[in-house]
């Protein structure tokens, strides 16, 4: 019978006659995953960088009918993975109409469900629950109580129904029983107090729930997914050992392992409007630089590695990069523009809020650390485009940067305004002796726009390798010879 025909069924009797059979949620997930694997269908769409690591682990856990704990630093798509698991549920399932815990018509758990079927039999009304409504998420915080998750005796309900507190009908169910036949996610599990974690023991293993000494057998049909940050184990709490023992699969997530994957994630997640896309062109070089900032932050001695550096840093920084170029174009009355290396300094505010600094970083200050990370990103990416300047210090071979450096040593400087018109920007770069020749040497076939971006990049790259002096001013970036104004050099150049 097709799903369209099934949805027309409104009573238990009709459901029986249709030959419908229910199954528990873990079998649903398993069966639908098996079908997806056989057909080659992608299950976790948009989850990048996990195809050979995390996703196979999740698939194994689902096939094993396991509860899952996703362990990883912030910004590693743990919650997104959990939410996408609803795609493996059946599109619709039947529930007893009016049941607060989504009773299965063939195996009701609640007093309401059992009584309804006892009274109405095959005339029991059913309704169809869509898989999109079968996902429940709870953020673990220290103020969460057992009553919130499991339930409590409701004295008002007992009084209205004129029943004793020992009657099951006096119970007000908490979030977990109300999530029966659903995927239930508890985020940041270590933040849950130990005594609250203990309340989950029997639900996970035996299906019992206890409410203020009222013990009842209620084999809830749940797929639990927990998320946790390793930092939480020491800073805020821990997962108690018996609970950890009952979570059958613990899967460790990770950050993107290379720039290309990280870049794809950023392009997928960044919120850039159509107007911005039409106005601002962002060269691939700048996209690589944005991603490199996150990679530098994860290795930096100024950043707390235990806290992690979320993928949201790259996403926010990329959005700021586009907005910086867009703002310049709007101010100058330009209909379109190409993002520049200097626009990356507009990403500092995005970087500041995404990194946790250690003591040394706090001493330097968040802005200086952000500037330092940008400089390090430029330094790391520079050798992917041009020869390593360091090698010419050690070897007696012709230095391709020599004419550029000599031009600055001859008492020339270059002051690039952050809001420079394109023609003025190009004119200034063209004035640097040896710069055009260097670009033609390595990128002769590049477009005019690309060549000017590369020219600017060369100056930043040489500064990051201490071949030139770069001064970041309020409204411009000034390039001078290495030995001038050393005492006024900006923050990041002084960080080592």
Label each residue range with its predicted role.
Residues 360-375, 379, 383-386, 399-402:
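Elongated, mostly alpha-helical coiled-coil "stalk/stator" tethers of large membrane protein machines
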Residues 266, 290-294:
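Short alpha-helical scaffolding segments that buttress acidic/His motifs in well-ordered protein cores
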Residues 2-260, 271-288, 301-305, 382-496:
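Conserved ASCE/P-loop NTPase catalytic core
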Residues 72, 276-283, 296-373:
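C-terminal helical "lid" subdomain and adjoining coupling/linker elements of P-loop NTPases
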Residues 61-64, 87-91, 206, 296, ...:
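Amphipathic alpha-helical interaction surfaces
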